[in-house]
UniProtKB/Swiss-Prot annotation:
Pathway: Sulfur metabolism; hydrogen sulfide biosynthesis; sulfite from sulfate: step 1/3. Heterodimer composed of CysD, the smaller subunit, and CysN. The gene is cysD. This is Sulfate adenylyltransferase subunit 2. It is an enzyme of class 2 (transferase). HAMAP family: Sulf_adenylyltr_sub2. PANTHER family: SULFATE ADENYLYLTRANSFERASE SUBUNIT 2. Its EC number is 2.7.7.4. One of its GO terms (molecular function) is ATP binding. One of its GO terms (biological process) is sulfate assimilation. It comes from Sulfurimonas denitrificans (strain ATCC 33889 / DSM 1251) (Thiomicrospira denitrificans (strain ATCC 33889 / DSM 1251)). Belongs to the PAPS reductase family. CysD subfamily.
Length: 303
């Protein structure tokens, strides 16, 4: 038996995550791993490749594409799929595309609900997945802090925060009826700093957007938004400036704020994490739609 007392804290976290990944594959018929292309997804993919090496991944990766992701994210996603040879499923809500749902005209709440939440539910119904891996961590946001590692979802993919299953030690309740599912979070006990240290130690590839670089940005409601393509509406009083910025978290580019930074290497990012006093999700505009907005989104089926 593995003596966890002799492991570093990162190796303990790694061992726990690998145990969860293997447990799910043993218990469920049709698991899938969400792949948002961010740093947490990069770590989760790396852990999965380790967990089942030398075999190929026993489940596909799913990316819900809103068509508003950073161009570099899509390029990186396709590159990683080709390098590692995993099965990549990409789904976009066709109704949202038909209605031209976008964050500028319809706002972040409607855009997130239709293109992300409904898009995800469509994909899960289409492929009939009964377990879905996600890269959420408890230190990210208050609604995620109280969520279990095995998070039960009903037939409509809804979460009831008042009716969660107990988790004693490393024992997980995987019982589901037909049509129900479990969202599984192998990185629940990791912190943002843990993620960056692990990426550095393991040499995990990540999207270049995480590193500081001179990028074209405009300021909207006090948030620096990168001008990633010609769809960005620029008002008369707004000026596009080249600034040294990076991203602590990634999503749809019109809803993701950049932070001023000079960190161009992993050690510099880690140093920045040690000194920062702000949340990594401060730049995610979807978190600020209303009070408790993330919990409401999760109850409706969001990850």
């Amino acid at each position: 038996m593995l003596d966890t007392k002799k492991l570093t804290h990162l190796k303990q976290l790694e061992a726990e995550s690998i145990h969860i990944l293997r447990e799910v594959v043993a218990e469920f018929d049709n698991p899938v791993m969400m792949y948002s292309v961010g740093k947490d997804s990069a770590v989760m993919l790396h852990l999965a490749l380790k967990a089942f090496f030398p075999a190929k991944l026993p489940f596909p990766l799913l990316h819900v594409d809103t068509k508003w992701k950073f161009k570099e994210m899509i390029e990186f996603r396709d590159k990683r799929a080709k390098e590692e040879g995993f099965e990549l499923l990409v789904h976009t809500n066709p109704e949202g595309i038909e209605k031209n749902i976008n964050p500028f005209v319809h706002g972040s709440a409607v855009h997130t609900d239709i293109m992300k939440t409904e898009g995800l539910k469509q994909a899960l119904n289409k492929y009939k997945f009964d377990a879905v891996f996600g890269g959420a961590r408890r230190d990210e946001e208050k609604s995620r802090a109280k969520e279990r590692i095995y998070s039960f979802r009903d037939k409509n993919h809804r979460w009831d925060p008042k009716n969660q299953r107990p988790e004693l030690w490393n024992l997980y309740n995987s019982k589901v009826h037909k049509g129900e599912s479990i969202r599984v979070f192998p990185l629940s006990n990791w912190t943002e700093l843990d993620i960056w240290q692990y990426i550095y130690l393991e040499g995990i590839p990540i999207v270049p957007l995480y590193f500081a670089k001179r990028r074209p940005v405009i300021e909207k409601d006090g948030v620096k938004i990168m001008v990633d393509d010609e769809r960005m509406p620029i008002e008369e009083h707004e000026v596009v400036k080249e600034e040294m910025v990076r991203f602590r978290t990634l999503g749809c580019y019109p809803l993701t704020g950049a932070v001023e930074s000079s960190a161009t290497t992993l050690p510099e990012i880690i140093q920045e994490m040690l000194l920062t006093k702000t949340s990594e999700r401060q730049g995610r505009m979807i978190d600020n739609d209303s009070s408790g907005s993330m919990e409401k989104k999760k109850i409706e089926g969001y990850f």
